[in-house]
UniProtKB/Swiss-Prot annotation:
The keyword Secreted applies. It comes from Hydrophis peronii. Keywords: Acetylcholine receptor inhibiting toxin, Disulfide bond, Ion channel impairing toxin, Neurotoxin, Postsynaptic neurotoxin, Secreted, Signal, Toxin. This is Short neurotoxin 2. One of its GO terms (molecular function) is toxin activity. The keyword Cell cycle does not apply. Expressed by the venom gland. It comes from the Eukaryota. SUPFAM superfamilies: Snake toxin-like. Binds to muscle nicotinic acetylcholine receptor (nAChR) and inhibit acetylcholine from binding to the receptor, thereby impairing neuromuscular transmission. GO terms for cellular component: extracellular region. Residues 1-21 form the signal peptide. Its main location: secreted. Belongs to the three-finger toxin family. Short-chain subfamily. Type I alpha-neurotoxin sub-subfamily.
Amino acid sequence: MKTLLLTLVVVTIVCLDLGYTMTCCNQQSSQPKTTTNCAGNSCYKKTWSDHRGTIIERGCGCPQVKSGIKLECCHTNECNN
């Protein structure tokens, strides 16, 4: 009985994937690609223009942005590249 219970617990943990983290890109503008592990389930890419040209910011989550900033949120690994 204990073996069956232990097996069920292990199967549940594997199926729920409790330790899952999402991988998001976090390089800025045209810098070489870098990634980070995120606890949440989304990545973002913010794009805007200023006196320097087009600026791109990437990271974890899906933040609120001011008007004039384009925001793309996505939900798969490295989807914000």
